Amino acid sequence: MDMAVKQIAVRKSITVYAPAAHVFRTFTANQNDWWPRSHHIGGSDRFTAIVEPRVGGRWFERDAEGVETNWGKVLAWEPPTRLLLGWQLDSRFAYDPNFLTEVELTFALAAGGGTIVTLEHRNLERFGADAEKVAAEIDSGWPQILAEFAGYADAHSSMEAAS
């Protein structure tokens, strides 16, 4: 009997009208400047979103009082073309160091200029009985996050080129 588990992934893409190096840097080094304030798991909506720029680095938030809450870790760091994050939030969006799904972002040249950012949040079947529910929540959350990101990256690309 084949007991294969159905793989569940969410895929989204968006075009940012800026070079890949700027787009990658904006997603990682400037995440706090564009990350939606509504998307946090710590106790305060006043927080700093941080991606440590290396394999094994943390992906986390730090609130105004200095309390840090982990979201996951960096699994692959390949500027300016690829970032692989380990999402370590369970079905209640609480940090679990023993749980991991993957969020892969690729940054590719768009026809006519700019960068196509493709996001795949995969291994969602690992949520077990909650997989379909969590996939639906993730599917509705990433478009808002990517729109905030693209808007910020677009608005700041000419400023970077001028400096």
What is each PLM-predicted segment?
Residues 1-46, 163:
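Hydrophobic ligand-binding cavity/cleft-lining segments
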Residues 7-15, 46, 58, 69, ...:
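Intrinsic-disorder/low-complexity, polar/charged segments enriched in Ser/Thr/Lys/Arg/Asp/Glu/Gln
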Residues 23-27, 59, 74, 85, ...:
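Hydrophobic pocket/interface hotspot
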Residues 28-32, 79, 147:
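Solvent-exposed alpha-helix faces
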Residues 30-71, 160-163:
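Short beta-edge strand/loop motif at the mouth of beta-sheet-based domains
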Residues 35, 49-50, 64-114, 122:
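Hydrophobic-ligand binding "helix-grip"
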Residues 122-163:
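A conserved amphipathic terminal alpha-helix motif
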